[in-house]
Amino acid sequence: MTDHYDVVVVGGGHAGCEAASAAARAGAKTALVTLRFDTIGVMSCNPAIGGLGKGHLVREIDAMDGLMGRVADAAGIQFRLLNRRKGPAVRGPRTQADRKLYRLAMQEAIRQQNDLDVVEGEVLDFEINEGRITAVLLAGGRRLACGAVVLTTGTFLRGLIHIGEKKIVAGRMNEQASLGLSATMDRAGFKLGRLKTGTPPRLDGKTIDWASLESQAADEDPVPFSLMSDRITTPQIECGITRTTSATHELIRANLGRSAMYSGSIEGVGPRYCPSIEDKIVKFGDRDGHQIFLEPEGLDDDTVYPNGISTSLPQDVQLEILKTIPGLERATMLQPGYAIEYDHVDPRELHQTLETKRIAGLFLAGQINGTTGYEEAAGQGLLAGLNAARRAAGGEQIVLSRTEAYIGVMVDDLTSRGISEPYRMFTSRAEFRLSLRADNADERLTPLAAKLGIASVQRMQRYGDVMQRLDAARELARSVAMTPNEAARQGLEINRDGVRRSGYELLAYPDVDVAWLARVEPKFAAIDAKTAERLETEAKYSVYLDRQKSDVAQIRHEESRLIPETVDFAGVPGLSNELKQKMQARRPRSIADAQRMEGMTPAALAIIVAHVRHYENAQRDVA
């Protein structure tokens, strides 16, 4: 039996849901293929959305009318703004989510989307004619003819779970792996690699001694992810905090040989910034303890996720470890932690549209491209789904640049540098992070979404209202001006150069906010709190944007500079251990080569340029 679609999306995880929604919103008749409808939107690992760098991605997805922000707002049970004490450009909105509420909200969003069908079935193979994908073949003989396919396999591509010496072929616990598609990709000539991720044991919250633990509350004023969310209405909860002990560390060291990671059973590389507890003890064993956040998985679910003790140790060792951790001495383990290996495709096999170079019409998104994290997957899914719809319709595909979105930074990093370990988004990866803030994602991307036809009427009305208020506030701030003497009479001391400064320029000063300006011009008192905060943020950053452009231009000017082979990077202050190791091992020949290294950041590149200059000057002095 053959059914006809414009776009077929394979997989109902975070990448697949965004891809299917984006393709359908773009006008493509879309099929989302998954083994079971009730697994759509499942949070496979940690029950949280957002965080540093990741929260920016969620805001960008929302700005293009994607799903993740709205679903997270509906399911969030502990909202916190990370890096609150730092500048707005690096603050990270995050929420812990109720797993059930998140899954159900995502399923409802998929169910309500026009032009989108959910097809339950197992994908066995693709039909490819003259270098172009033409159909998806399902178990049972069903054929889905199509103009484009988005493949979002997550950890299912030849997935293999490890619990100590025990191995289970699975995509995640109790769900079958995808073996046929891995063979399909291999036959097509794709360069495949092996990666690994892990998850901690799940605990019964009723058996945890909460009274003995430190607690962490949600923010009193939760900040939603979505422009479409007026406020958070889901009840907010507290989390518990505990730490590993010296007894924990001794037990882990004594059993390292039984860990799948350290026994040689696992060939895949794990995420550097989400290490297993075994890795933490081996690499940072001199610490007194490692923090563990005890995160309830739902409002009516006693399951607790102990964030910080991901492991592939045997089940009996995991039980003994729990007994050494304060508050968990009598905890019941509902499911053991495990590591999972899976295949991924070298992302350099992709165009920046996320279409593969080998097969026209085939797009990849999510962990198959070597990333880690729900948010990274969702961002890729949105872009891949949009471009798949445009490919099927014969339209021009979209590339997001590094200057306009973190999604663009991520895709450029992946497709130009490749990966040797799972890729995670950080704000430090962006050259233009002062202008790529979480608070202005809508202004950067919603007009583009409207132009592409994927933003709803309701979204555009809400966006128009927000921008109307912001533009009015900007105009008012620029219309009011005062001299240094006038400012001094209001208690503000600035350079007495006789120059009149607008209210907008005055907002760049640390002691000036909209409330201060209201003392000078009462009209400012009518500006609402959200608009005021955004106006203050952009005004304060405006004075640094020219410097940001200059720094980026300087780095580009230095790209041709050669790096002497004798330069030692091991002791360079300010350079991360990751990059010290990579610079020492790979010895890039030039600044341009260093810039293309996986994990390189604009700030790190500036440090390397300065170090090479210093080294060359020192060598000349010696000569």
From Swiss-Prot:
GO molecular function, one term: flavin adenine dinucleotide binding
Protein name, per record: tRNA uridine 5-carboxymethylaminomethyl modification enzyme MnmG
Domain of life where this protein originates: Bacteria
GO CC annotations, alphabetized: cytosol
Subcellular location: Cytoplasm
Family: Belongs to the MnmG family.
Residues binding FAD: G11, G12, G13, H14, A15, G16, V123, S178, Q367
